[in-house]
Amino acid sequence: MGWIGKLLNGGDEKNKPAPVTAAAAPEATLQPATITEIDAMYYRWLAAAGSAQAPAETEQQILDELARLVREPIAGAALVPRIPAIIPQLMRTLQDENMSAAKLSAQLAQDVLLVAEVYREANRPCYQSRYNASPSINNMEGAIMLLGQNGMRMLLARVAFRPIVSMQSGGLTVRTAPLIWRQSEKCALAASLVAPTMHANAFDSYLAGLMANVGLVVAFRLIDQMHGPDVFPQSDAFIAQVFAQARILSVRIAELWEFPQSVTRAIGQVGVDANADADPQAQALALGERLSKLRMLADSGRFPADDPFVTTGLGKSELLAFGKLADDDE
């Protein structure tokens, strides 16, 4: 090739600039799992559902019955045990900032199971000093002083809801009710931990976390009674509707049980995904539900605790709360 050709072609091959290559595409940013996706995994894990899918007609019949209970919440409330009568009296005492440990001790003495629960809680390792091998708490006033006002409130709230898991029913309810209760306790704890950063009331958030799943317990009782022996209702659309209707039923039952309006409002406002404009109480509950369900799935071996499905979208404080939800040795 002559010099003119070389000039037109940019000179020798060795002097040619390297061909321009397309810039490498940035790695796709992981998006946090939606609560709908988490609910679907949680539901199928709860039920230990196989692959056999129930007919659409069966799913619709269950949803229709659940909708009826939403319209008639007294019937729905009849499917779960009532809160023990002594609990509201104790809660009223605990609302008093100047409560007397002696007065509360006298009220607690009316229920031997409550007395045992208070002693058990006060003697848990987490209440004992690392450097002080103190003797066990063996008097009620001492236990009350150790737990404090907020600790007593949370203890009584847990005790009030615990009968829900002792219901005798079909095999599915026997399996799911204790798991739902464990998740509810974790939800209540998580919601109370994140509440201050959202300017929400920690104790109301705790109550909302305990109450939010009562409707789901009722839903599983219906499913237990109505699904066929070899198939299970588990379509994505069905699961989404079960959680939506169960939430409304939880609100209706909470209203019947005269829960604070802030609690019923929070449960009702928690949507498919947390809304930044939602009531702070609802935001705390939504995050509590997310963290507690992910914790249950992680602890069951469904995911490692540090799996991106679990951790994506969680900030430092939320990861700290997630860590505190791990089961402890009592």
Model regions and ranges:
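Conserved alpha-helical "signature site"
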Residues: 2-210, 217-225, 232-330
